[in-house]
Amino acid sequence: MNDQDFAATISQTAQEVFRQPAVSYSADLVFREIPGFDSILAIQFILAIENALDIMLNEDEVDNMHTMGDLMTLVKAKKAA
């Protein structure tokens, strides 16, 4: 899977979980800026990403993710390992 595939999967998953298709899920998007974002949606999003990409994210990794770019960097590192 290349960077474009990761980005497409993450963007599609974000659209499905957050139900905000008008939002641009770019690398600089801060999660808290997504309309309706709350802790329940955050958990649902993380679980959906884990399932879609067959990875596991630990609590420290999730706590240090603030943007879509942070998530992309983490996903690439996980998949490369």
What is the predicted role of each segment?
Residues 26-38, 59-69:
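Glycine-rich loop motifs involved in handling phospho/adenylate chemistry
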Residues 63-81:
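Charged low-complexity stretches with an acidic bias
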